[in-house]
Design a protein with these regions (language model features):
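Active-site nucleotide-donor binding segment shared across nucleotidyl transfer reactions
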Residues: 33-79
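N-terminal regions immediately upstream of nucleotidyltransferase
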Residues: 1-45, 63
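Conserved catalytic core of two-metal-ion nucleotidyltransferases
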Residues: 26-27, 34, 40, 78-131, ...
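Hydrophobic/basic alpha-helical segments enriched in Actinobacteria
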Residues: 6-7, 21, 70-73, 81-82
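Non-transmembrane, amphipathic alpha-helical segments
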Residues: 17-21, 25, 77, 143, ...
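Core structural elements
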Residues: 2-3, 52-56, 152-160
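Short, compositionally biased low-complexity segments
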Residues: 1-12, 59-60, 111, 124-133
Length: 160
């Protein structure tokens, strides 16, 4: 499936509006990325492709960035896997916000960066190891709760 063709089909559907459109576009994007992930990666328990930010919330518009995290458990071949995932996405003309990290690296960054911390709150797995993704989400939520008194004033200040 071409995500470009699917986006055009969804845009041409005059019945789709607002949140229903964003949900269907997110679902179509999920399927496209799941197919891509399956073609690049054999079944492995040390990798997960995770949607974060607006994409994690299933709030995609036609020009939204695809914000994704390739989570790994210290995979030695991660650089070649990442390139095999990112290039087909770029070839489709997609704007890609991407990162490649372990759980520890992700939590270390989220501990210091409000944007990363909040993006993890709306993260969801697209493909790969559910247990690896669940571990990250659980630890990120614990970390968020432990830093609530620090983060909430910063979050409030960023809104104004």
């Amino acid at each position: 499936m071409s995500i470009v063709a699917e986006r055009k089909r969804l845009l041409a559907d005059r019945e789709l509006r607002g949140s229903e459109f964003t949900l269907q576009l997110s679902d179509a994007t999920d399927q496209w990325l799941q197919d891509l992930f399956s073609s690049v990666v054999d079944e492995r328990q040390d990798l997960a492709l995770i949607a974060v930010g607006g994409y994690g919330r299933r709030d995609l518009s036609p020009l939204s960035d695809l914000d994704v995290l390739l989570l790994h458990d210290d995979a030695q071949d991660i650089e070649s896997i990442a390139e095999s995932l990112w290039y087909p996405i770029w070839d489709q003309g997609e704007n890609l916000g991407h990162s490649v990290r372990t759980i520890t690296e992700t939590l270390d960054l989220a501990n210091e960066d409000l944007d990363t911390a909040t993006s993890l709150l709306s993260s969801r797995i697209i493909a790969g190891s559910q247990s690896l993704a669940d571990e990250l989400v659980g630890l990120a939520l614990q970390q968020w709760k432990s830093k609530t008194k620090l983060w909430l004033p910063k979050l409030a200040a960023s809104i104004h």
